[in-house]
From Swiss-Prot:
Keywords: Lectin. GO terms for molecular function: carbohydrate binding. Belongs to the leguminous lectin family. Tetramer of two alpha and two beta chains. It comes from the Eukaryota. PROSITE patterns: LECTIN_LEGUME_ALPHA. This is Mitogenic lectin alpha chain. It comes from Vicia sativa.
Length: 52
């Protein structure tokens, strides 16, 4: 038996990443028009910072 778990959350990135961070997505096909959905995305950072 395989158990699968999922978690979904809406996170306003402007509230949690610095102003200078840029995030973008790009997709293409050979057709004139196509709809693309981002079904999964992850972000990891190890930028140093100070604790308060």
């Amino acid at each position: 038996s395989v158990t699968s778990y999922g978690l979904s959350a809406v996170v306003p990135l402007k509230d949690v990443v610095p102003e200078w961070v840029r995030i973008g997505f790009s997709a293409t096909t050979g057709a004139e028009y196509a709809a693309h959905e981002v079904l999964s995305w992850s972000f990891h950072s190890e930028l140093g910072g100070t604790s308060s």
